[in-house]
Amino acid sequence: MWGQGVRRFTTSVVRRSHYEEGPGKNLPFSVENKWRLLAMMTLYLGSGFAAPFFIVRHQLLKK
C-alpha cells in the first residue's frame, strides 16, 4: 500500500517537471553568442593542447 503511494508520487513529480527544449538547452554553457562560444572553446581546447609543451619547457629549464 505504502509502495504504491510512493510510486504514484514519484511518477507525478516526474510528469509535472518540465525543462526547456531545443538546441543547446541541455548544455552546461550558453551557445547563444557564437563569438563567446568560440573564445571559450579556443581557451579550453588550446589550454589542453598547450599544457604538455609548457610542462616539457618547465622540465628542460629546471635543471
From Swiss-Prot:
This is Cytochrome c oxidase subunit 7C, mitochondrial. It comes from Carlito syrichta. It comes from the Eukaryota. One of its GO terms (biological process) is mitochondrial electron transport, cytochrome c to oxygen. The modification N6-acetyllysine is found at residue 25. Keywords: Acetylation, Membrane, Mitochondrion, Mitochondrion inner membrane, Transit peptide, Transmembrane, Transmembrane helix. The keyword Membrane applies. Component of the cytochrome c oxidase (complex IV, CIV), a multisubunit enzyme composed of 14 subunits. The complex is composed of a catalytic core of 3 subunits MT-CO1, MT-CO2 and MT-CO3, encoded in the mitochondrial DNA, and 11 supernumerary subunits COX4I, COX5A, COX5B, COX6A, COX6B, COX6C, COX7A, COX7B, COX7C, COX8 and NDUFA4, which are encoded in the nuclear genome. Belongs to the cytochrome c oxidase VIIc family. It is a single-pass membrane protein. InterPro entries: COX7C/Cox8, COX7C/Cox8_sf. GO terms for cellular component: mitochondrial inner membrane; respiratory chain complex IV. It is found in: Mitochondrion inner membrane. Residues 61-63 are mitochondrial intermembrane. Component of the cytochrome c oxidase, the last enzyme in the mitochondrial electron transport chain which drives oxidative phosphorylation. The respiratory chain contains 3 multisubunit complexes succinate dehydrogenase (complex II, CII), ubiquinol-cytochrome c oxidoreductase (cytochrome b-c1 complex, complex III, CIII) and cytochrome c oxidase (complex IV, CIV), that cooperate to transfer electrons derived from NADH and succinate to molecular oxygen, creating an electrochemical gradient over the inner membrane that drives transmembrane transport and the ATP synthase. Residues 1-16 form a transit peptide. Pathway: Energy metabolism; oxidative phosphorylation. It holds the Pfam family COX7C. The chain crosses the membrane at residues 34-60. The modification N6-succinyllysine is found at residue 25.
